[in-house]
Every structure is written in C-alpha cells, then in structure tokens.
Design a protein with these regions (language model features):
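Class I S-adenosyl-L-methionine
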Residues: 1-114, 118-119, 141, 148, ...
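Conserved SAM-binding loop of SAM-dependent methyltransferases across substrates and taxa
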Residues: 271-283
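Active-site capping/gating segments
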Residues: 196-210, 401-403, 408-452, 470-471
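Class I SAM-dependent methyltransferase SAM-binding "motif I" and its flanking Rossmann-like core
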Residues: 87-151, 320-321, 365-366, 410-434, ...
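S-adenosyl-L-methionine
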Residues: 293-350, 354-361
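Conserved class I S-adenosyl-L-methionine
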Residues: 261-270
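Helix-to-beta-strand junctions that scaffold the AdoMet/dcAdoMet cofactor pocket
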Residues: 386-387
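A contiguous loop/helix-start segment that scaffolds small-molecule binding in enzyme catalytic cores
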Residues: 2-17, 30-33, 80-82, 150-242, ...
Length: 471
C-alpha cells in the first residue's frame, strides 16, 4: 500500500516564491531566509528587493509587460536558482497564482508568509467564512459595489493611499453611507496603525499606500439592496426600453447557467442587463456585450460600473460581423485580485475554472442573442462560436425572429418555448390583467446532444406542420 505524500517533490531548478511581510527580513522564517540567501537571482518589486541583504545575487525588478517578460526572464536564467519575492502569502491574490498557472505546480515552490488578509481579519476579529475579500489593486474601485449587502463584511485590498476615500465615496453613492470603515495600514510592520470612521463624512487624509479597508456594510434607510440572484428590478438599470425584462431575464440566466470563471457573449445587448447579471453571479465571471448603438453601449458601461462589474467589455458593432475574432481578444477578468498590478493570467494547466486573466483566448461558454435574431447568419454565427458544453439562449418578439428560431429548432433541436407575463393594473375603477408582449425563447446546449425534432410524425404538430395553427 502506498504511503501518503505530504510534500510534493520540487525540481532543483524550480522557481521559488517567498512571501515577505511588512516586517521584512526579520519576519521571515528560517526556511525562507535560507532560500533567499541561496538564490542566484532575486525578482520582485523595489520595496521587497530592498528588504533583503544584497549578497552575491542579481536583483531584478518586475518586467514589463509582466507575463511575457516573466517567461523571457526565466528562460534567460534557466539553470540558476531564481527566487521571486512577493507580498505575504503569494497564493492569496498574489503572483504565486500567476506562476503556477504559467509553469505548473511541479515547477514552482511557494514559501508563504502571513497575508495582509489574514492579518486584517485577525485585527478585526472576523472569521474568514464571514467576510469577503475584494481587490482593487490596479482595478476600478466600483468592483466593490457587487459585494455590497446589508451586514456584509468586506476587506478591500487597496491600490494606493487614495483608495479608502474612493471606497467611502462609493459607499455613500450606493446607499451605504452609514457603513463603518477601518483602514489598516502597514500590517505586521513597525508603523502599523488603524484609522476608523463612517463612510459618510470620511475625512481621513491619505497616508500609507499599503492598506486594507475593512467595511462593515450598513444600508441607509430607504436605499435599495441588490441581490446577486438574477432578476434585478428593471429600474436598477438605465435603459431606453431595450431591456430583457426582469422575469424573463431571470429565466434566461437560468438557461444560460453561469458557472464560476465562465465567459458570456451578450449579442444585441441593449442595456447590458443579461451580461451584467451574469457577471454578478460570481466574481470570476466574464462577459462581452456587443451593441451596435454607441449611445446604448455607453449606457451599458454606466450600468456595469454602477452595479459593480466595471470589467464588462463592451464592443460597439453590428453582429454577426462584430463577432469575428472575438474569441481571440482580451476579456478582462473580474476576479483578478493580484496584490501587484499586472496583466492577466491564463487558464490553469489541466483545466478547471480559470483563476484570473486578461489575455484569455477562449470561446464563449454561453451566448445570449437578444437582438438581431432574424439577421441572416446570426444564429449560425453564435452557434459556431460556442465552445464545448456551450449554451445559447435566443429571444424573439417579432414574427420574423420567431421564424428564425423555429427554423433553428427544427435544424438543431434544443428547446423552444413561448413566455408571456401579465401584471395587475388599474382598469377603470377596478383592476385587470395587462399582458406584456409574448416572447419566444430558443435554448440550445452542446452538452445535451439534443436531436432535432421529428416533423409531422403523427404524434404532435412539428415546425411547419399545417396542423400547428392555434386552436
């Protein structure tokens, strides 16, 4: 019987990543010090490189561009002992994750220190399972908006000294002005300190760029709290009427079935509501909104920022032409949470949900076709773009678009359904039902291997059957 292996063997020429805290060399473990002392090449930021003794070692700052530069750097120094210095725990929103994804677990050894996240939780007395981490390092501060909820505890990893004031301003704008903020600076170092206050009226001056903002979310009276469950109210979005309505949007997203790290194309995005709610489901989710109207495209960007997913990519153009080449372009990753600003990271070796990236070249996992269904070649272009296991959902409200979906259903199978919603409304002095426009929905999944329906088999009317008229 084989014995369990508690330590994976690492090749002698492996890249070693050493985590270092604000206390510098003095805070390193014996193992970490020995690793750094034995290095031929040290790679890291200027601050970290300055924390360790010079010795007989080559010190190199982060290359630019980051990812491509790292590959060149390690190739140049192949056969030498290369040590990378990183903040705290390199696998908590750090460069260790990037290196593992680039080179694999057998080529990278990690020697962690205590992360700023762990120190912040310890200072605040917050259990890990009862708080959420959001990084705005080199990112749009509006990413915090997705995580806001009454009673939520947030640890915001700051980009610089101005981040606390930006977070306070965002909290006030989103109706969380009563939230308490604690700015934890230089955690683990000699200059560690904490500033506290309330978001509304936050007037603390910017100080150390090395800070974590702890937020205890409190919703202001009368303010709206937005759920992460798909189906936000229509008035949560700025729109001109071109929006997939709330009830139908919730059902549409159930069919699109977002999973962590997956990519959606929202074709004919209108207000961007489907793409935005897709990204809100999980912080690693990505989306591209394709919209021909520049004014609507600008509106999508505003909606995405206001609803906490500013990394939504908006493409101004008409489909299907605008879809050409999209699978080979950069899509920002809403979950990238590096403690050092850097370009994105690739999909882990061996598959699995991606942990972060801005330079992926993958096909969409799902496509929502909300406009232009009747345009020749549109449905086929969307189907051709789908990756393995991909899902497509298309909506139609006109006879021409419905005919296109009926044809697609006859050709490819899947599911074809009609949805109608009626709402109670005043009818004179009484109340009656007001119907919304009936919507036809075609959904298709590559994973289902659905066969096209048989036409006119005698059991039920098929597409094009003369007996399919309403009765």
């Amino acid at each position: 019987m084989s014995q369990p292996a508690f330590r994976t063997p690492v090749p002698a020429d492996a890249i070693t990543v050493v985590g270092i805290g604000a206390d510098g060399w003095a805070g390193l473990s014996e193992d970490a010090r020995a690793t750094v002392a034995a290095a031929d090449v040290l790679v890291g930021g200027e601050r970290h490189l300055g924390m360790v003794p010079d010795g007989n070692v080559t010190k190199l700052s982060w290359p630019k561009p980051f990812r491509a530069g790292l590959s060149d750097l390690f190739a140049e120094h192949r056969g030498r002992r290369v040590v990378v210095l990183a903040s705290g725990d390199p696998l908590v929103s750090g460069v260790g994750t990037t290196l593992l994804e680039m080179f694999g677990r057998n080529a990278v050894r990690v020697v962690p220190a205590v992360s700023s996240v762990a120190l912040a939780r310890a200072r605040m007395g917050w259990p890990a399972e009862r708080s959420e981490v959001v990084s705005v390092v080199g990112r749009n501060v509006h990413r915090v908006g997705r995580a806001l909820a009454p009673g939520q505890r947030l640890l915001v990893l700051s980009s610089d000294a101005s981040t606390p004031s930006e977070v306070a301003r965002l909290l006030v704008e989103r109706g969380y002005g009563a939230s308490r903020m604690s700015v934890l600076e230089d955690l683990g170092g000699d200059d560690e300190r904490c500033m506290q206050g309330v978001a509304e009226g936050w007037a603390q001056p910017p100080t150390s760029p090395l800070n974590v903002v702890a937020v205890e979310c409190e919703l202001d009276p009368g303010a709206a709290a937005w759920s992460l469950v798909p189906g936000l109210p229509d008035d949560a979005f700025e729109h001109d009427g071109q929006i997939t309505k709330r009830d139908l949007r919730a059902g549409c997203l159930a069919r699109l079935a977002p999973l962590p790290g997956q990519l959606l194309w929202d074709v004919g995005a209108g207000s961007g509501s489907v793409a935005i709610e897709w990204m809100r489901v999980h912080p690693a989710n990505r989306a591209v909104a394709i919209e021909a109207d520049p004014e609507r495209a600008a509106r999508i960007r505003r909606n995405a920022e206001r609803l906490g997913v500013p990394d939504l990519r908006v493409v101004v153009g008409s489909a299907p032409e605008a879809l050409s080449g999209l699978a080979g372009t950069q899509v920002p990753d809403s979950a990238a949470t590096d403690s050092h600003p850097m370009p994105g990271r690739g999909r882990p070796a061996g598959g699995g949900p991606p942990a972060g990236s801005g330079d992926r070249h993958d096909a969409p996992d799902a496509v929502f076709l909300g406009g232009g269904v009747s345009v020749p070649g549109m449905v086929d272009a969307c189907l051709d773009a789908l990756g393995p296991g991909g899902r497509l959902v298309a909506h139609a409200v006109t006879l021409q678009a419905e005919a296109a979906l009926t044809s697609a259903y006859a050709t490819y199978g899947g599911e074809l359904a009609r949805h109608s919603v009626e709402r109670a409304a005043p009818l004179g002095s009484l109340t009656g039902w007001t119907p919304a426009r009936t919507l036809t929905q075609w959904s298709f999944s590559r994973a289902s291997h659905a066969e096209p329906p048989e036409v006119g088999d005698g059991s039920a009317p098929g597409p094009g059957d003369p007996n399919d008229s309403p009765r």
